[in-house]
Amino acid sequence: MKIMSIAVSKKKGTPKHPISEVRLIENHGIHGDAHAGPWHRQVSFLAAESIERARARGLNVTFGDFAENIATRGMDWTHVAPGARVRLGDTALVEITQIGKECLKKCAIYYRAGDCIMPREGVFGRVLKGGTIHTGDGIEFAGKSRGSGSISGGKQEMTA
């Protein structure tokens, strides 16, 4: 299982631009990304396989177009739950906090891509341990935290 793409943007609701490496900051997120900060969606994940399925349906999309920070290959995000932990590269650790999200309006991503799969297939987390990660680094599940997941408002979030 590996990281296929890392992407960042300066503004929320827009496609992200791929870069080769990035620094994850504990309790903050990805250095230089619009979604960084003291909240539960500091980092977003999407399976590369999901992007490939969107392409097969005729969408003209590539890594970063759905505003995902990290596209992965071989990670089965369909069975992950809030509280799961994910190790990225040699040192970084992210706790999954939310599965999917609500989109209240169609953003630039929807209009550019013709669909947005992040509300259905995106996975979000917060950085527990920082570190520098690179495209091509390994990624793996690393256990579960003590929190429990619940479903609220059409999305699954952490509860304390």
Q: Where would I find each of the regions flagged by the language model?
A:
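Metal-cofactor-dependent catalytic cores
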Residues: M1-A160
